[in-house]
Amino acid sequence: MINTENQSNFSIKTNIIASDNLEAYFLNTWELTELLFSSIKDVESYYINPDPRRHPLIFYFGHVAAFYINKLKIAGLYSETLNTHFENLFAVGVDPSTKDDLEKHGWPNYQEVVVFRTEVKKIILSIIQSDSLPKCIDWDSPYWSLLMAIEHERIHFETSSVLIRQYDIEMVKKPDGWMYKLDYDFNPELEFIKVESGNVQLGRPSNSNMYGWDNEYGSLNCFVKSFEVSKNMITNAEFLDFISSGGYETKDYWSEAGWNWIKSQNLSMPKFWIIRDQKYYLRAMFDEIDMPWNWPVEVIAYEAEAFCRWKGNNMRLLYEAEWKLLTDRYFNNELLDFDSYSNFNTNFRFGSPSPVGYFALNSDLPTDLLGNVWEILSNDFYPLDGFKVHPYYKDFSLPFFDSGHGMMAGGSWASTGNSASRYYRLWFRRDFIQHAGFRLIKTI
């Protein structure tokens, strides 16, 4: 397993760029991808779609490498021809609503992709080691494209881990040193905390010294009313009560889109749950394990919303401004200092979720505000005031500001670098599974 006891796992500071630090950060990023993909037993499995709305895994193996070349070319940092076919083939991911994207064929030989990746790695290292590397990189710098590509690869480390988790268990093996956080003696109860009203400002500060994606910039001032929030995220044990009470058979708990989805997929439990001989198991990354009842339940947004309706008493999911209020009162700096990460299951500290509240720092505050699993929010994905597209990646956020994409915050155990920042704003279709869960909230 990648050594998580060093700072090369954490997002680089853009105002004090040093080639050795940037090189370590890039290599750590690259090695995370290599480690994850080493879990695939046979090359043939790279050409299987673990999720029919995604490309086969071979695409993502090549995509993160091609992205470096394509963005560096746009920025003017690389102008040679490496492999035009691969640069085009691996350029853009799949749009689940586009049939032509889903039916793309003609994927290259695995070994050819390995060679391509090796060449890309050499190119990136040569750019990092060049005397022209600046000491400071900002939004307007051509080298922003390099940071963009590194953080993009870290995003795909996490999203690819979700795809691999959907492979048949016989197709994968757990890499050496990959650790699950199993602790069955920690059984928190559902507890609510009162949060007083307050003002918040959403958005990454313009003078931030970390890389940020375009949708993180801009700002929005909000007044947040007082509310009560569950101290911990909802656990597998708590979600079992919803299942046992007929939650998946009761239409009133579901939105129309959610009900249609679970019926079309014949769902009766969360994606990674397994029931065999009247006993529940959980599909972890590479194993089927006894159900860890104290882990946060991992669900799609539709399931989280249905649970809230089942609970009654006007229970709902957090809005982004409410989540921001919680983090403002927990954190006083942008990127937690290195020692503070000991309080959260993030930056690949473990290769799985952990018992909710296991790393609780302050008994008066909600737990797992960063890491463990993503926090599913109520918001549709939307731009902040003053949002502007970055010219190096014009379609990163803009096409997804709509009611079809819901937001998440806080990161997961698999979130690293920029993704582990409290300013990171994630979005997904509400029927897409991620390492994501939720907590309950009600307005007072």
Question: Where are these predicted regions, by residue range?
Answer:
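Active-site-flanking structural segment that lines cofactor/substrate pockets
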Residues: 70
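Short, conserved phosphate-binding/catalytic loop or strand-edge motifs used
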Residues: 137-144, 324
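Functional-site microenvironments in short loops/helix caps that host divalent-cation chemistry
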Residues: 149, 153, 163-212, 217, ...
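Disulfide-stabilized, aromatic/cysteine-rich ligand-recognition loop
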Residues: 1-55, 59-66, 74-133, 143-168, ...
